[in-house]
């Protein structure tokens, strides 16, 4: 087919532009079909010519007249692996009789590289059949079908109808994309829930295994210590080391109920106290008191490791309770003259405090943790997702600009932009309006909800601890009244008062330990809140309730204490510096994580 000249091509294009659309499409389809057939014929001719060229290389020069017939046949025989000469055509039509008149062929011998190169067909030869549909033709047919469908869709419609149809199709496409993304997100959330369900039992088992170990170690160490006044200097040191280990292990735990379950093992009951003291005798007034006090002192100190994972208000109140309990033991034991009365009072006091502690644990477990606010749906089709809103807004802006280009400038309604009443910002992906009419941005509204939930949980914890302190104060007053009614003797009072001074001295030495061990377990995020809670009015407990006349808690509240303390900033800085754990403990905590 000869090529057209430029004039003929231009004339043909003009004729096609004047023809109707249907005839133009038919002509285009016919032309594509003809071009496809021509391409197939050219490929077949090319393959045939290459076969003939290869046959010319194989045929001997003595037979120039038999090139056409024997060349093609020789090439086909080479492809089949036949090694006999091509000039002998006597046995060509009889299969299986190739080597009757010739010498036998060694099939095991290796063929040389030149022969192997001659036997392999050329990669340029492409064999096509008429039944196969090549990829260019199939792709062109698909394009023709799509083009025909698009032309039929817009046929006989105006510009406005076409724009409306395009907008409708665009909305359908957006809905399909949103549905696809939603299905993907649902699948991801299901996989995450399955992983969480599989991981939680492992963490709980690890917590139940690790946590009770310091309790048993502490009780065994206390039961083996000698019961003499000179051993008082050794026992607090052992208690400190045990307390440090318990705080470090509890800091790695994140489940609060297991810590409280292990705390029940640490708290001694009256039977354990009676078994440690042994049978009461009149001559053992001095020895029973120091043997009883370390056991009772160990109870509040070990309990200070419980609220390490709680909020700071619970930590401060538990620390105050740990200060109260050693003082109450000393003051009750001072006016008791006989060992039987002292044993009964100690048993009743330990039983009452154990019941009070169990009730406090039950109350704290019933208080639910602060629930986070309901999260917004973070997937693409959600209107609460900022990225989705950005894209929709950008699309609307572009569409409005395109629509307004061809129209006259009309008077548009002007709306004042919103401004956040709290942070004064004028841009947010989602505006919120409160009941009182204030308009807030999304970030301010979320922070306000979190603060309200956290404050509510803190108030619940404070009320629970204040109620527990009041009950403990009532128990202490009742025991004081019972002790005042019993007769007293001068020698017993003097001996017990001397023992009371010794115990107060050791209590003052041990008093900072629960606070320091508590500070090691408190996370960094809660330390800033701890200094704020230290100024709360609920902490203004009189010094007489603590049972420690020599201890001043002016670092907790400025109203407590006779002299004027340092400034607020200095006290907060000193308080924060005291809470920084040593390097060795921080390294051990990071190593256990």
From Swiss-Prot:
GO terms for biological process: chromatin remodeling; negative regulation of DNA-templated transcription; negative regulation of transcription by RNA polymerase II; positive regulation of DNA-templated transcription; regulation of cell fate specification; regulation of stem cell differentiation. The modification Phosphoserine is found at residues 17, 122, 129, 134-135, 208, 333, 338, 340, 486. GO terms for molecular function: sequence-specific DNA binding; zinc ion binding. The keyword Hydrolase does not apply. Residues 62-123, 213-235 are annotated as: Disordered. The modification Phosphothreonine is found at residue 120. SUPFAM superfamilies: Glucocorticoid receptor-like (DNA-binding domain). There is a cross-link at residues 33, 66, 97, 147, 199, 281, 353, 454, 467, 498 (Glycyl lysine isopeptide (Lys-Gly) (interchain with G-Cter in SUMO2)). Residues 165-195 are annotated as: CR1. Widely expressed. Residues 140-194, 449-482 form a coiled coil. Gene3D superfamilies: 6.10.250.1650, Erythroid Transcription Factor GATA-1, subunit A (3.30.50.10). Keywords: Chromosome, Coiled coil, Intellectual disability, Isopeptide bond, Metal-binding, Nucleus, Phosphoprotein, Repressor, Transcription, Transcription regulation, Ubl conjugation, Zinc, Zinc-finger. It is found in: Nucleus speckle; Nucleus; Chromosome. It is linked to Gand syndrome: An autosomal dominant syndrome characterized by global developmental delay with motor delay, moderate to severely impaired intellectual development, and poor speech acquisition in most patients. Additional features include hypotonia, feeding difficulties in infancy, and dysmorphic features. More variable features may include seizures, cardiac abnormalities, and non-specific findings on brain imaging. Both CR1 and CR2 regions are required for speckled nuclear localization. Transcriptional repressor. Acts as a component of the histone deacetylase NuRD complex which participates in the remodeling of chromatin. Enhances MBD2-mediated repression. Efficient repression requires the presence of GATAD2A. Targets MBD3 to discrete loci in the nucleus. May play a role in synapse development. This is Transcriptional repressor p66-beta. The gene is GATAD2B.
């Amino acid at each position: 087919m000869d090529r057209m000249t430029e004039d003929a091509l231009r004339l043909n294009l003009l004729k096609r532009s004047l023809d109707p659309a249907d005839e133009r499409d038919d002509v285009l389809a016919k032309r594509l079909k003809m071009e496809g057939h021509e391409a197939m014929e050219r490929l077949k001719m090319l393959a045939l010519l290459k076969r003939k060229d290869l046959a010319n290389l194989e045929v001997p020069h003595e037979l120039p007249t038999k090139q056409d017939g024997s060349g093609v046949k020789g090439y086909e025989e080479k492809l089949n692996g036949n090694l006999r000469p091509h000039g002998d055509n006597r046995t060509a039509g009889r299969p299986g009789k190739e080597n009757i008149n010739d010498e036998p062929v060694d099939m095991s011998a290796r063929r040389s590289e030149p022969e192997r190169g001659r036997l392999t067909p050329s990669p340029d030869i492409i064999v096509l059949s008429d039944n196969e549909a090549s990829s260019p033709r199939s792709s062109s047919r698909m394009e023709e079908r799509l083009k025909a469908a698009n032309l039929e869709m817009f046929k006989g419609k105006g510009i406005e109808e076409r724009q409306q149809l395009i907008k409708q199709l665009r909305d359908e496409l957006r809905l399909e994309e949103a549905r696809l993304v939603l299905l993907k997100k649902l699948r991801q959330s299901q996989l995450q829930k399955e992983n969480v369900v599989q991981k939680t039992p492992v963490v709980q088992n690890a917590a139940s295994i690790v946590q009770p170990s310091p309790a048993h170690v502490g009780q065994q160490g206390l039961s083996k210590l000698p019961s003499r006044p000179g051993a008082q200097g050794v026992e607090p040191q052992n208690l400190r080391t045990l307390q440090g280990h318990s705080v470090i292990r509890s800091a790695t735990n994140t489940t609060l109920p297991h810590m409280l379950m292990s705390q029940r093992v640490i708290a001694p009951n009256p039977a354990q106290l009676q078994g440690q003291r042994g049978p009461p005798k009149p001559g053992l007034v001095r020895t029973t008191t120091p043997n009883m006090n370390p056991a009772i002192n160990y109870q509040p100190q070990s309990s200070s490791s419980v609220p390490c994972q709680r909020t700071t208000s619970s930590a401060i109140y538990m620390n105050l309770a740990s200060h109260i309990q050693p003082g109450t033991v000393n003051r009750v034991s001072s006016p008791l003259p006989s060992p039987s009365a002292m044993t009964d009072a100690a048993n009743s006091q330990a039983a009452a405090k154990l019941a009070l502690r169990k009730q406090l644990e039950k109350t704290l477990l019933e208080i639910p943790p602060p629930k986070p606010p309901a999260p917004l749906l973070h997937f693409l089709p959600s209107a609460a997702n900022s990225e989705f809103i950005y894209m929709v807004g950008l699309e609307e802006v572009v569409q409005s600009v395109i629509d307004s280009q061809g129209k006259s400038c009309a008077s548009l309604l002007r709306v004042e932009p919103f401004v956040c009443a709290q942070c004064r910002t004028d841009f947010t992906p989602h505006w919120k309006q409160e009941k009182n009419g204030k308009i807030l941005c999304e970030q301010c509204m979320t922070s306000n909800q979190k603060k309200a939930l956290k404050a509510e949980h803190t108030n619940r914890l404070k009320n629970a601890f204040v109620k527990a302190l009041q009950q403990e104060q009532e128990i202490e007053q009742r025991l004081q009244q019972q002790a005042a009614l019993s007769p007293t003797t001068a020698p017993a009072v003097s001996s017990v008062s001397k023992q009371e001074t010794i115990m107060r001295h050791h209590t003052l030495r041990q008093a900072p330990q629960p606070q320091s061990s508590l500070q090691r377990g408190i996370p960094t995020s809660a330390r800033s809140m701890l200094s704020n809670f230290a100024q709360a009015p609920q902490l203004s407990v009189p010094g007489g309730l603590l049972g420690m006349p020599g201890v001043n808690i002016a670092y907790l509240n400025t109203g407590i204490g006779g002299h004027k303390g340092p400034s607020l900033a200095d006290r907060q800085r000193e308080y924060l510096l005291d809470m920084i754990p040593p390097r060795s403990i921080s390294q051990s905590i990071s190593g256990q994580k």
